[in-house]
Amino acid sequence: MSEVKVSAKMVKELRDRTGLGMMECKKALEESNGDVETAIDNLRKSGQAKAAKKAGNIAADGAIIIAQGDSKAFLLEVNCQTDFVAKDENFAAFAETVANLALENNVTDVAAIAELPYGNGQTVEEARVSLVQKIGENIQIRRVEVLEGANIAAYRHGLRIGVVVSYEGGSAETGKNLAMHIAAFNPVAVADEDVAADLLAREKDIIEAKARESGKPDNIVEKMIEGGLRKYLEEVTLLRQPYVMDNEKKVGDVLKAEGVKVLGFKRLEVGEGIEKKQEDFAAEVAATQALANK
């Protein structure tokens, strides 16, 4: 396998996502042959990237729009370059219109949404281009998520986080509280069995690597792995999390007492996985590398 040259952009992405210094990030990327995700895993295994949650840092602006029908809800992310434009009435009107068009036409593909008739003889894409020219910022329709169900609760936290949750039983207030909880705690799944196998395997690998570094006997290491996985599932599964309305109780216990079953949910947060441009970063990295090579 040929060696990948570590670029300033790659170093910046790893630095933004871990909070580590430039030289540490450069070294980690060299060891992972330029693979950012592998570098993050390796840093977590070694204990350098202790703030694991920083791996999901937000680095873009825009808005999440919720369009809701009788038995279906659409979440749409529309991006811009600054929070100033995200609050602009022209941007907001465009984003709301596009979300409602997607719902009305039941279109779940971003490319297909771009071709929908927007009005005034324009398609959505043509309206987007016109808005870019008017506002002076790049604007993109990034992604759409759809949730179906007889009972759907929705919650939007500011402009940046949108949640829809499908459930059976309970009241509308319970549904709204659930959506608020998901916005705040960001679970990846409803229950343990819903966590993706690859995600669980990746986390187990990281936990095991750190446990074995302790030098303890295998039977103790196994218990450390079990404990680590249990803690991980308590953090990422909805039913195991402490309830946002009463953190003395677990979500699962509250729902059981109220006769509520969660069928599914969708959560979008503006800019997940997108990095902002930092104009002088390449020069900063180059200067640091030059010093390191002296």
UniProtKB/Swiss-Prot annotation:
CDD domains: UBA_EF-Ts. Residues 82-85 are annotated as: Involved in Mg(2+) ion dislocation from EF-Tu. This is Elongation factor Ts. It is found in: Cytoplasm. Gene3D superfamilies: 1.10.286.20, DNA helicase RuvA subunit, C-terminal domain, Elongation factor Ts, dimerisation domain. Its main location: cytoplasm. GO terms for molecular function: translation elongation factor activity. Belongs to the EF-Ts family. The gene is tsf. It comes from Psychrobacter cryohalolentis (strain ATCC BAA-1226 / DSM 17306 / VKM B-2378 / K5).
